[in-house]
């Protein structure tokens, strides 16, 4: 693998020149006192150093070694304990955490960049702090003050970790049929019993305690999803003075043997009357858990982005160094036996596809993160409502589109290496294996597409969609003639997406299958148009940029490539959606 270098220049461009995030922070009382442009850039610079120096060098060896289970205990690969200690002591686990309990208090748009850096360094490693931060979000939003005071400081400090225990052997997407039970006790606690599977970070040796958030049902709970409650179940009970007490019967029965993320412990967790404490109200557990889902799903999208970035950095270095054949137009490196493969059109196509999708994804994920910040911190109810609705609309796109493209980019990066990309020592095949899970967990991408199409577009009668569409139209209307090469094709594709949205809304009235039939390709069409909007914004900023000519001309060249070679994918997606659901049901089940 090439030495990982955090893409700080591009992050600064997106945050400062494209979105001017400091202006947003100044208008949000919860952030104005905490962060400004200089502070944010200092945070990102330091995060870049920590991830590149302490985490990235572990990735290849950790993939080979993996995690090991023995008698209920899980050991992580060599170097992980020390790297996690360094990461935690720097405050990075709590980078977006509540300052009242020891968090750094950075806005989501900054913690999103940190997430990209840590996941590009090692996706397996990044899962441990990600799950802890997610658990903290739910605890902070829904738990009692006593639970918050008892657990959050050590979790933000990285001394304790967190996990989310949702899935059961028979219950994945349909959590309403879970069987884990919680029995009330006289002292106000609960005894939690059941088995959970696919639990990331359910057991490991990185922290002295692990705080599990467990979905379970009370004895008198209503059937289905409306009968689910959320419980905090610590690995070790915590005494009144904050010291660790007895071991709770929340144990790891085994770890999964899987395709990728070998250094992340994916556990089967057994709860045998484990002591737990309710988080939020009885039978409102899904609402409490879903507080963090928008953050977590954006985080998974960023994992796809991060894997693509790491693969791209490796592929660019290899393409510059690898000598094979001569350029079609004649020798470029006349003093060498062959030209670097970066001169060949197809290699350039793959590299530019990666670059355009990565940089578009970085801008889009930052945009969504800014909406999360507005929804959380704005005191203007209208602003907060608009941001909440945009978050609802865009989160499934961020999760699914970034991870689908993350796999595409990782495969391109592997392909640039040719046969060497298939060999483990180069690291490219690891990135393909690792990023694959991002399309599956935190809600499969098919489920994300159904969420976008059914719950967000159709259920709102297109109102959520029009919020975003209208914003893009306002940008197009205000763009000067110098942006015509981007604004005009953006407008044309937006017209297509508007028409497609209306078509699906109409078709769904008569045939519910049309939603499912359209959903994945609709999400992709939406994603390409959203990226076109991001690229038009970036082109405007690049045209206004001063100094650093190579960066800005490179940005404009990549924008032109996106509009010329990638945005036209919308055409085939629209045609496919409008073919309807009929052909999906021409075969009986036995004919497959």
How should these model regions be labeled?
Residues 1-126, 150, 373, 582-592:
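Amphipathic, small/basic residue-rich leader segments at the start of a protein or domain
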Residues 2-5, 184, 261, 367, ...:
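Alpha-helix capping/hinge segments and adjacent helical runs
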Residues 32, 64-76, 288-299, 313-354, ...:
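Glycine-rich cofactor-pocket loops
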Residues 80, 128-132, 143-185, 369-388, ...:
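Internal maturation/activation junctions in enzymes
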Residues 113, 459, 475-592:
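C-terminal amphipathic alpha-helical interaction region
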Residues 133-135, 144-147, 442-444, 452-496:
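A structural-propensity feature for long, helix-poor, extended segments
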Residues 189, 193-247:
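A short core secondary-structure module
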Residues 198-200, 237-253, 258, 265-296, ...:
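A glycine-rich, basic-preceded beta-loop-alpha segment at the flavin cofactor/substrate interface
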């Amino acid at each position: 693998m090439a030495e990982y270098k955090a893409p700080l220049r591009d992050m600064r461009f997106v945050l400062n020149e494209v979105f001017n995030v400091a202006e947003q922070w100044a208008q949000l009382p919860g952030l104005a006192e905490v962060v400004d442009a200089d502070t944010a850039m200092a945070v990102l610079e330091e995060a870049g150093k920590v991830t590149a120096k302490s985490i990235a060098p572990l990735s290849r060896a950790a993939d080979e070694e993996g995690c090991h289970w023995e008698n209920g205990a899980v050991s992580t690969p060599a170097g992980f304990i020390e790297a996690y200690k360094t990461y935690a002591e720097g405050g990075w686990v709590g980078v977006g955490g509540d300052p009242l309990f020891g968090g750094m208090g950075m806005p989501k748009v900054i913690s999103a960049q940190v997430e990209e850096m840590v996941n590009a360094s090692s996706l397996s490693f990044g899962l441990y702090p990600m799950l802890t931060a997610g658990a903290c979000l739910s605890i902070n939003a829904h738990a009692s003050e006593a639970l918050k005071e008892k657990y959050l400081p050590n979790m933000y400090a990285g001394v304790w970790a967190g996990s989310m225990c949702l899935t059961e052997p028979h219950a994945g997407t349909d959590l309403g049929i879970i069987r884990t039970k919680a029995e009330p006790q006289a002292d106000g606690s609960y005894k939690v019993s059941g088995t959970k599977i696919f639990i990331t970070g359910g057991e490991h040796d990185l922290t002295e305690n692990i705080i599990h958030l467990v979905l379970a049902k009370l004895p008198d709970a209503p059937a289905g999803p409306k009968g689910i409650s959320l419980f905090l179940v610590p690995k070790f009970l915590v005494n009144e003075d904050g010291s660790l007490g007895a071991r709770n019967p929340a144990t790891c029965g085994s770890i999964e043997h899987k395709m990728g993320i070998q250094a992340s412990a994916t556990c089967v967790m057994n709860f045998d009357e484990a002591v737990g404490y309710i988080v939020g109200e009885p039978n409102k557990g899904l609402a409490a858990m879903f507080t963090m889902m928008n953050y977590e799903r954006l985080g998974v999208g960023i994992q796809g982005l991060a894997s693509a970035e790491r693969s791209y950095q490796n592929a660019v270095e290899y393409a510059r160094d690898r000598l094979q054949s001569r350029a079609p137009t004649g020798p470029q490196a006349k003093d060498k036996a062959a030209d670097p493969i970066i001169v060949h059109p197809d290699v350039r196509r793959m590299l530019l596809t990666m670059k355009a999708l990565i940089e578009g994804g970085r801008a889009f994920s930052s945009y969504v993160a800014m909406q999360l910040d507005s929804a959380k911190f704005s005191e203007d109810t209208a602003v907060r409502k608009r941001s909440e609705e945009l978050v609802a609309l865009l989160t499934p796109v961020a999760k699914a589109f970034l991870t689908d493209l993350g796999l595409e980019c990782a495969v391109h990066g592997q392909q640039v290496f040719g046969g060497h990309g298939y060999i483990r020592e180069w690291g490219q095949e690891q990135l393909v294996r690792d990023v694959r899970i991002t399309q599956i967990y935190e809600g499969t991408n098919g489920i994300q597409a159904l969420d976008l199409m059914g719950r967000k577009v159709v259920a709102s009668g297109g109102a959520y969609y029009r919020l975003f569409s209208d914003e893009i139209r306002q940008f197009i209307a205000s763009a000067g003639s110098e942006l015509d090469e981007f604004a005009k094709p953006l407008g044309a594709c937006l017209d297509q997406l508007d028409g497609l949205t209306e078509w699906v809304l109409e078709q769904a009235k008569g045939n519910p299958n049309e939603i499912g039939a359209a959903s994945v390709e609709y999400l992709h069409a939406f994603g390409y148009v959203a990226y076109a909007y991001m690229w038009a914004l970036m082109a405007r900023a690049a045209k206004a940029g001063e100094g650093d000519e190579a960066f800005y001309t490179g940005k404009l060249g990549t924008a032109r490539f996106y509009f010329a070679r990638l945005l036209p994918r919308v055409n085939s997606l629209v045609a496919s959606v409008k073919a309807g659901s009929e052909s999906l049901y021409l075969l009986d089940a036995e004919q497959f």
